[in-house]
A protein has these predicted regions:
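Metallo-beta-lactamase
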Residues: 52, 152-240
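Active-site HxH/HxHxD metal-binding segment of metal-dependent hydrolases
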Residues: 26, 54-147
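C-terminal regulatory/interaction regions
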Residues: 248-315
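Divalent metal-coordination and catalytic microenvironments
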Residues: 25, 38, 49, 78, ...
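Conserved beta-strand hairpin/beta-sheet module of binuclear metal-dependent hydrolase folds
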Residues: 12-67, 165-176
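Residue-level marker for buried hydrophobic side chains located in beta-strands
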Residues: 46, 75, 98, 172-174, ...
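Positively charged, polyanion-binding regions of nucleic-acid-associated proteins
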Residues: 236-254
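Short, glycine/acidic-enriched loop or turn micro-motifs at the edges of active sites
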Residues: 33, 42, 52-53, 81, ...
Length: 315
């Protein structure tokens, strides 16, 4: 999800769905949500994510058929619809196994849970679209035993509940949405974060990994540790900027809808329904985080839930 809506778009439509090499065994398919490929052997491959909709799945199937490759596995970094939109059609045509982690695995099998988590309840029909709601696919909990040989995984939550990165034995790491791309940050300022504390921790942790290349879903591959760490720094810096903006907005106590509006106005944003739901989820999560660390208080007045900055208060 969610970076498909606040996201990098591949430059040059002629390059869409072309195969590009990363390492000795790894490739990516350039498309709105990049699809990773790990070559298990001469005939079998594992996908890392499956694209943002069924059409992406069809194009990946055609490409793999052309190469003589059989898709035996899909590993989803997380459950957002832009990362598993091709799951169902690929699984129907190949019988491949789909592996994901904990909550992500559950939400891939039951995708409406994902939208409920974002919106905070049953979603209106306008949000039941291909950008927000993937078709259900049968997924399994990923383990060290069922992941294809040559691959491993590691937990990097924050953007989503139980997002993982996929580590390949040729030095490639597929990072999903652990970090947001620079162009998206500069254009939209607000990007999807489920948990601020976990997001910052994961941004720092990915900088501790060793790889030849880090391949994310929504921005070009990174081949330099310094470049990766600079992007992580930018993500953390922007997140804290947004937290401070929200704190300032809450100086006199405000309801959520006013906080969200003033945050969007601060950055000069006018959003679609999809984007509004996503930005709203991020801002709600930030309010909860600020409350839990004691920087924002919650009051109920006249049946309004008010969020109020605690600066200057003493116990």
């Amino acid at each position: 999800m969610r970076d498909a809506l606040f996201a990098y778009s591949p430059k040059g439509s002629n390059n869409l769905y072309e195969l590009a090499a990363l390492g000795e065994k790894t490739y990516f398919i350039d498309c709105p949500t990049r699809i990773g490929i790990y070559r298990i052997n001469d005939t079998d491959v594992c996908l890392i994510d499956s694209g943002n909709n069924p059409d992406a799945g069809k194009k990946v199937l055609a490409l793999c058929n052309e190469k003589g490759w059989k898709i035996t596995h899909i590993i989803n970094t997380h459950a957002h619809a832009d990362h598993n939109g091709g799951n169902a059609i690929i699984q129907k045509r190949t019988g491949c196994r789909i592996l994901a982690n904990c909550y992500e695995q559950c939400m891939i099998t039951h995708p409406r849970l994902n939208n409920c988590c974002t919106f905070g309840g049953r979603t209106p029909m306008e949000l039941d679209n291909k950008f927000m709601l993937a078709e259900s696919s049968a997924s399994e909990q990923i383990t060290d035993e069922n992941i294809p040989e040559g691959l491993s995984f590691r937990l990097f939550p924050g953007h989503s509940f139980d997002q993982i990165a996929v580590m390949c034995d040729d030095g490639t790491i597929f990072t999903g949405d652990i970090l947001c791309g620079k162009s998206t940050i500069e254009k939209y300022h607000i990007f999807f974060i489920r948990d601020a504390a976990e997001y910052e921790h994961s941004a720092k942790e990915i900088c501790e990994t060793e790889a030849k290349v880090w391949c994310a879903a929504h921005y070009p591959p990174i081949y330099s540790k310094d470049e990766l760490c600079e992007l992580a720094r930018l993500n953390i810096e922007k997140m804290h900027e947004l937290l401070n903006v929200i704190k300032e907005i809450c100086a006199d106590g405000k309801i959520f809808e006013d906080i969200l509006k003033e945050t969007l106005d601060h950055y000069g944003l006018e959003l679609s329904f999809n984007q509004y739901a996503i930005a709203g989820s991020t801002v709600r999560g930030f309010l909860s985080y600020l409350h839990d660390i004691g920087e924002i208080a919650v009051d109920i007045k006249n049946n309004y839930l008010m969020w109020r900055n605690c600066d200057g208060e003493t116990n």
